[in-house]
Each structure stands twice: as C-alpha cells, then as structure tokens.
Amino acid sequence: MGFGQANTSILSQLAAAGSVKRVFAHCLDNVNGGGIFAVGEVESPVVKTTPLVPNQVHYNVILKGIDVDGDPVDLPPSIASFGGNGGTIIDSGTTLAYLPANLYNSLLKKITTRQPVKLHMVQETFACFSFTLNTDKAFPVVNLHFEDNLKMSVYPHDYLFSLRKDLYCFGWQSGGLTNQDGSDVILLGDLVLSNKLVVYDLDNEVVGWAEHNCSSSIKVKDGSGAVFSVEANNLIASSSSSSSSLLLHFHISWRRSRGKQTCKEWTTSAYL
C-alpha cells in the first residue's frame, strides 16, 4: 500500500509536501468484519508504544518475552539476545504469525498443556483439533512483551480459527524465517494485530497499540491541527476547520476464511 519507511512511500511523500505527519494507524476487526485505516496523529484512544529498530526496511521491534497465562515461554537465543537486525517484525500485510520452529513447538505445548486436545495437521500447514466448547473460556491468553513494557495480549479468538463446525486450527505457524546473518525471525501479522488500534509513528520511530473496538471510531489530528473522528464507515469533522491539509481515511472490509484474511473492499476519502 506504500506505507513502508522508505522515502519513496506514499506516506513519506505526503509528509514531505507538508500534508501530514509520518503517522498512520489501522484497526482490523476479525469479529464483525471491517475496520479503520487513517493517516494522521492519533488523539484517542491513548496508545502505548515501543521503539522501532532504526535503519530497517520493515517495522522491527524488540520482543523481550512471551508467556501463556503468566507461564513464560523460552525464547530462542538469537531472539532473546536481539541481533542488530531486530528479531521481530510487525507486518499487517501478513495474515498469520510465524515463529521459529522451537518457539512454535514450545508455545503450542504450553497452550495444549492448559487445554489438552488431540492435534492433527490439515493441508500440511495447520495444527487442528476437534472442540465443542467455548474456546475463549477454555484456552489461555498468550502475552507478548516488548521493550518499554509494552504488552500485546493475543486471545483464543485471535489465534484460533474455525475450518468448520467444531474443528479449530492454530494460526501460529512454524515459519523457519531467518535474517541474512542466520538469526531467527518472528513475523507477527494480522493474527495478533486484529482487534487492536495499531499506530506507526515514523517521526518518533515508535509503534504501539491498544485494544480497541474496531467497529467504532478514533480521533485523528491532521497536519493543520484539526481533529477528526474517523469511524469504520465514514469521516466526520469534529472541529470547524476548513483545513487545506490532507487526511486520508481508508474503510477496510475483510473476512477470515480458512486462516486467511481477504480484503473485500477499499474506499478512500481525502480532505484538501
């Protein structure tokens, strides 16, 4: 979509023109569908942040730990020690979450120890099981801990998806991804980012998130200082300003199907 960190990205070009700050946010709703994408400084809700690793092509962050309902999961040495390239990437263009094989195995073992199930592979990719009870009540919460005490909680309805009635699969994947130096890489996609407002602040070199109802709205400030209410379906000015700046708003409509989020519709609004 052209919202990377490069100077040639859409966001960087808008910022260079003085239209907006280099800040954007998205909120993906995997419960009701839909969501929000906005360019501009987020006024509310308040979002805690963690530093971005500098001089990276991707949105790399420092993962400090993982726990399953408070029970720590051992991180691979190359992730825990943090190499120069940054071992964890935030990527909304990726559907699932990809972990080094040893971390993937440890995480699933912790989860299935708390809620025993008989796993079998589907499509040679997904670890699946039969289950008739409420998964949110039966399965544990996975917590990811990042630098500057930022936590991301991933709930069962986030990391599990249903192939059909009473058949569920884990969205966690054994990725086998590595940096050029051979160190392990964790790739966190929409599996963990959904149902959260995620803010990318390139001016301050941070990324952050807060749990949020992605079918509701957020408050965004444009380059002129005007504050707008950005809703999942429309854009309404909440301050009487005839701003000459630009505020972009994307309405996102998407669905989860067999472990894949599919973009169904994009609409954009621009205020000049």
Question: Model-derived features: where do they sit?
Answer:
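C-terminal reverse transcriptase regions that engage the nucleic-acid substrate
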Residues: 2
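C-terminal catalytic lobe of pepsin-like aspartyl proteases
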Residues: 5-239, 250-254, 272
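Cleavable N-terminal signal peptides of Sec/SRP-targeted secreted and luminal proteins
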Residues: 244-251, 267
